């Protein structure tokens, strides 16, 4: 059977139809049809080129008009630079920084003056339709040792290959797309993945998205476009959910992180619920700003940014980072985010998340340049300066005076329901009277939890345990009444214990005797006896080995 009439091609055609008819991407079939040269359809000179140079120059000149050709050429050369000493993930990180933040170039302007570090933007993130979206099928790429590979679909934006899609027929395991194709392509044509933002795998029934560093189990489904949607695992849902032009650019610009906390670069892409939840929280801020300017809500109402309830284990700390970094990137004004926790381990864990992805420096608590408050005095000093991020325990608010009237401070309270009713929480609000508050929690609020609602407002995003289990992010916990049961083998045990107590406690007064009887009556020594614990351990091992 030829490729044109294969089952793989049928699902590929379905996917490309979605790109063209529903998403408005340009599409092209390159299989046995591509020419080469400046005047060719894609403008490639040979199969080794993975950046579409012709489109790249068209868009970068459009977005950065009036510059000498040397400036555009330098931008292209910088984006094409290669390194033989860096890993694929490190190269991908460097390319991402250039593509997202712009490419710095030096040139002589029309007045003959030297211009240094002029940043040329590659994408128009504010108006998606100003960009060139092109999905190309079956494009031959030549890589190591002149070996060639032909990916199913490559998605180019302004000539940059940001999207890689590998498709399989419905009867084939999706994991094969990862093991047999994706990993092979990374090895043979790594240059394609220098620029890659997203990897999509699908067999028409299962569909997953991941990054170039992700293992297969870290690829996740994209089942919803809005939080209210019922989750559907389908090819059209993941393509529409991820590749709609505005969502695609938003996901690229604001929902990619690179974590270097373990000594090697790991690329992280927001999961479906994080993308939806963070955007809902940010839309709520924008909505309240508009209402406040129109005089429809009070300042107190504007300061209540809502409760972000995403169940434990759903990546809440990373959601905080996405939330903060999108506001820093898209909002005007120098915001300070104050992350407040009530436990040392949470404080350390959240700071570790922020520092691991480069949002804050990796410095020890107590160091001169630390952004973690080590005392109430240190906290006052930190709040007196304009930092992007600060971290503290609620207990450091051991003072009552006002520190600043700044209205561009957002307090992020982790496990918001636990510590909002006491004196320390009151001190926090007195110190920052114009701050806004958002609560992050992994625990649902009780209906009568009026204190938390009074401070933060209602839910702004909800991702509960059941939905997390359905999405494969959490494992259900079942209780099976099994194991080592307690039973009475000696019917006269009570009389024997009484006899021992009577024989050994003649010199005890009534209170001491009562205390001895209470100790013998406790279940703990029986429940934790070595013989019983050994039996429980053996049963647990048997259960997990045979389930």
Task: Report the location of each language-model feature.
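Conserved helicase ATPase motor motifs in RecA-like P-loop NTPase domains
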Residues: 311-312, 417-418, 431-448, 472
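Conserved motor-coupling elements within RecA-like helicase/translocase cores
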Residues: 372-390, 402-406
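Conserved helicase motor
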Residues: 139, 344, 366-377, 393-399
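ATP-dependent helicase/translocase motor core
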Residues: 2-336, 345, 349-361, 386-389, ...
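Interdomain helical connector at the RecA1-RecA2 junction of SF1/SF2 helicase-like NTPases
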Residues: 450-547
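SF2 helicase catalytic motif II
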Residues: 404-438
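Residues immediately C-terminal
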Residues: 346, 396, 415-419, 445-446
